[in-house]
Structures are given as C-alpha cells and as structure tokens.
Curated annotation (Swiss-Prot):
Residue ranges with Low complexity bias: 475-487
Biological process per Gene Ontology, one example term: regulation of transcription by RNA polymerase II
Function: Orphan nuclear receptor.
Species this chain originates from: Caenorhabditis elegans
Name recorded for this polypeptide: Nuclear hormone receptor family member nhr-35
Upper classification of the organism: Eukaryota, Metazoa, Ecdysozoa, Nematoda, Chromadorea
Domain NR LBD, chain residue ranges per copy: 186-438
A GO CC term attached to the entry: nucleus
Length: 542
C-alpha cells in the first residue's frame, strides 16, 4: 500500500479523520520513515496514530461534535467557559461541571429557576442558578445515560463504619437532615408567635374600644391626600403615647422569654425599651402616611413645611422637634426597604431583649441574650428564605433602622422632659417611669418609689396616680389566649387627662368580661397600629 502512494502526498488531520484502529495498523506497517525521492518528509506513523486518538478524546474528529459546527474552542468548558479537561458525558467540560452533572443525575436532584430560565452561566456565577447550569449541560451535549451508577467503595466503607459507631454508641443521634427541619419549624413558629402577640394586643384594644363605644373613628377614606384636618394637638400626642405605654407592657407579658424574668428585670427591660418602642411603632405606622407621623389615635404630626399658616406657630413651638428626623431617618428607610410585618415584629422583639440594659441581673443577662439570638436567627432565616436576592437585607435593616432608633428615642424623651420642666404639659407617673428613664430627670428618680410620686393637679380636681410598670407587671396574665378577658382585666386602661391638660378625670379598673369606665368621655384609646400592614388579618387590622 505504501509503495503505491504518490511520493508528494502527505497525510493531514483531515485524512486521519476516517482512520480506525485497523487503518492505523496498516499505516504503521506501510509508511516509510525516510522521505521518498528526498522531496517531501513522510509523516511519522506513531505521530499520526497519536494525533488520531487525541482528536477522538477532544472531539476533533467526531463528526457530531459542536466544536466543528459552532466554532467553539475545545480548550474551554462549553458550559461555564472554564478550562476544559476533556469530553465528559458527551460534552467538552471542566471538572466542576462534570461533577455537578454527575451528582445531579445520580441523586435525582430537581432544580428551579427564579428568573424565567434566562440566567447567564460562566465560571464566576455558575453556582448561582443550578437549574440553568444543568440545562446548559444538557444543551451542550451531556447525556444522563452515560453517567454510571455510583461506585464509591471508600464512601461505602465509611458509611458502614459510621453505622457501627452509631449502633455501639448508646447516645441516640440523628442525621443533619432530621435535625435541621425541627429548627426551621421552630424559627417559623417563633415569628408566628410574635405576630400572635401583636394580635393579642389588638384584640385587647378592640375589646376595650367596643366596650367604651365613643371612640372617634375617621369618616374619611384612608387614601385621602390631605390630613391637615387631623393634625394632632399636644394633648392628643400625650394621650396616644400613654395608651401605647400601657399596651406595650401587656405585649411584653405575652412573650414566654419575658415571663421567665423576675419582676425587677422585666421593669429594667421595659424602661430601656419603652421610648424606642414608641418611636419604632410610630415610624412603622407612618410608612403609608403622606410626609407625616401617624399616631395611635389616627391623628397626624405633619412636617412644618406642610402646615397651614394658622398651624405654623403651633408646629414651631411643638415639643417634638425631632419628628422630622423620625420621618427622614426611620420612616423613609422602612418605606425604601419595604419592611414587612414579620421583619417588624422580629426587630421590635430584638430591641426589647437588650442584654446590656443597665440594671439587669447576671442571671437575666444570659436569658435575655439567648432570647435575642434566637429571635435574630429566626429573622435571618426568614429573610434568607423569602428574600434570597437581597443578600444584604439583614444588614440594611439592622443599620438603617436600629442604629438611629436609640438616638431618636432619647431625643424624644428629652423633648417630653422639656414640656414638663417648661410647664407646657403635665406628665403622668407612667411616662416618667418609662419615657423619662433615659433622661437626667429619670436618673434622679431611680431611688424613689414609683407610685409614691403623686402628680400635681389643679385645685378642685382629684389627685390620682397613673399605673406604674411594676403594678402592671404584677397583673394576672395566666392565659395565653389572644382573646382572654383576663388581659383586659389586668390592664389599667385610662388616660390621665389631669396630667396632660389640667382637666381632672376619674376612672375605674375594668373587670373581667365587663370592663367599665367611670368617665369614658375623657378616654382616648389607641387605634389599631400598623394600619398600612397586616393584610393577612383583614378582620382585625383596619
């Protein structure tokens, strides 16, 4: 055969494409290693065969290969464009994509794409969307029928050894798959319980409003463009704040971790938390408002620039000079980040359980720290599962909301203190105990018995003492039912108008099932908080 080949003919890779093993043997025995007539060098037979098999490995000589049709470089992976290591399962691929395809087929994994199966797969983000990566493996030529069954002898031996250890160890153990599910469920139940606590307070508030019967509800649409006709007065603001302080105590008593603490430690947490609670709640309630702060009683504190001329003087001299800071530093971030209900209740509970609150006992510090860690872990898990694309959301919520909260709440406490010392308004004992705890005045009162301080009232009016935190914490809350009437009985719901506007008011403690008020005309109970939220409870939140 070699004697009949023209001396000027030279084999090229295109000629070698059709060679098989038999032809390679013929070439090996037929070709001469010396050039005929000394004109053209003859191809080395061993190099020809080596080149042939190398082409088979890289797909150069495969007529079905995509490398010839689409011009792809066989040195890069056709899936992620990383450095290819050869043909794996029918496609030019790297070791990473080869292993990914093998694991997916062997373990019957099912993936789903969140972006309409249009993810771009490259070596930098190939692990972002497994569905699109697997589909690209298939479109690049990988075949699942070429994946052999798993033959991991070492892995089987390790599994047998682990089984022997498990059988010999008297301590029961569970696999990670079994232990993760209860933890995930516990986190979900924790957030649900926090929402239930909000529902408990809402149910209590609705019950009292129904029994009172004279609370003023707004007659205008919730989507009204103007709310200047609902501008709050100083008396309205203090009434709303007083009611919110009463309800936050009842909210705290619905939390199991809070009830494990002693009465003294509970009072410490509430004094540290009350001002931040008022600020955080009014900010979250104002997310749906139009450049204003919305109070519990459905009234508004507008910006100074939004007020009418006859209200300008009132706003300029208003004690809440930091209202606009709350709008800018809390309301706007909440609106921008679209803070939802579960995130809000989780952040609120984290603020309550502050392990560095001054005055906590050593035993309470560990309990409070564990409670905060547990709630924050549930918060992180919720964000990770429900908002996976916002990888920095936990940090954004923490820094943009919780960071300015403490500073703003202390500023508001100082504003309230200013109204007291300037004689603009009288502040009741409950506010002094909770809101003014962070001010110099509150620190001077630490050695005084809470309810021994009677508020001055005008002549002719009756002296009275607002319920202090210690008294409210001692009330009975034996049942955890959201609609339990004992909650209504335990809460001394009243608004001390004498402490705010100089008008004497009498009240009686509501009794179980039939709460009664001696003078309900002076009662200004809070409306449902978070009116722009909690859509999952349409019958409760208005």
């Amino acid at each position: 055969m070699g004697n009949k080949i023209h001396a000027g003919f030279t084999f090229t890779p295109s000629h070698a494409r059709s060679l098989d093993c038999f032809v390679c043997l013929l070439v090996l025995f037929s070709f001469r290693s010396t050039p005929p007539h000394g004109r053209h060098p003859a191809i080395e037979p061993t190099l020809l065969i080596s080149h042939y098999y190398r082409g088979q490995m890289l797909g150069t000589y495969n007529g079905d290969s995509k490398a010839e049709t689409d011009g792809k470089d066989n040195s890069i992976c056709h899936i992620c464009s990383d450095v290819a290591t050869g043909r794996h399962y029918g496609a030019i691929a790297c070791n990473g994509c080869k292993g990914f395809f093998r694991r997916t087929v062997r373990r019957n994994y099912e993936y789903h794409c969140r972006f309409e199966s249009k993810c771009e797969i490259d070596k930098h983000n190939r692990a972002v969307c497994r569905y699109c990566r697997f589909m690209k493996c298939i479109s690049s030529g990988m075949r699942d029928d070429q994946v052999q069954s798993e033959r991991d002898v070492i892995g089987k031996r390790e599994k047998k050894d682990n089984m022997k250890t498990y059988c010999q160890d008297p301590t029961p153990r569970t696999s990670p798959e079994l232990t993760m599910s209860p933890v995930e469920d516990e986190y979900d139940q924790l957030l649900e319980s926090l929402l239930k606590s909000e529902m408990t307070i809402q149910s209590l508030r609705d019950t009292v409003i129904t029994q009172t019967g004279n609370v003023e509800y707004t007659t205008k649409s919730k989507n009204r463009l103007s709310h200047t006709d609902r501008t709050a007065t100083l008396n309205d603001v203090l009434k709303s704040m007083h009611s919110q302080l009463l309800l936050v105590i009842e909210w705290a008593k619905t939390l199991p971790e809070f009830k494990q603490l002693s009465g003294a430690d509970q009072a410490v947490l509430l004094k540290n938390f009350a001002g931040q609670h008022v600020t955080l709640c009014v900010a979250y309630r104002s997310v749906g408002a139009n450049d204003a702060l919305k109070l519990l009683n459905d009234l508004y504190i507008p910006r100074a620039s939004k007020t009418t001329p006859h209200l300008k003087e009132y706003v300029d001299g208003f004690y809440l000079r930091d209202c606009e800071k709350v709008m800018d530093q809390l309301v706007e971030p909440m609106r921008f980040l679209k803070l939802d209900n579960k995130e809000f209740v989780a952040l609120k509970a984290c603020v309550l359980f502050n392990p560095v609150a001054p005055g906590l006992s050593n035993h309470a510090v560990n309990l409070v720290l564990n409670a905060r860690r547990k709630i924050f872990a549930a918060f992180e898990k919720y964000v990770r599962v429900n908002k996976p694309l916002e990888t920095t959301r936990v940090g954004d919520l923490t820094f943009f909301i919780l960071t300015p909260l403490s500073v703003l709440s202390k500023s508001i406490s100082e504003d309230i203190m200013f109204t007291k010392v300037s004689g603009v308004a009288r502040i009741d004992v409950l506010m002094e105990e909770l809101i003014l705890a962070e001010t110099d005045y509150g620190e001077d009162r630490q050695d005084q018995t809470p309810c021994s301080i009677m508020n001055d009232t005008p002549s002719g009016s009756q002296d009275m003492c607002s319920p202090c935190p210690e008294d409210l914490l001692r009330t009975s809350t034996s049942s955890n039912s959201p609609t339990n009437s004992s909650l209504t009985a335990g809460l001394l719901l009243k608004t001390d108008d004498a402490m705010m506007s100089g008008i004497g008011t009498q009240y009686t403690t509501p009794q179980p099932h039939t709460p009664q008020f001696a003078d309900s005309s002076h009662l200004n109970l809070p409306y449902a908080p978070f009116t722009s939220s909690y859509n999952q409870y349409p019958n409760t939140y208005s």
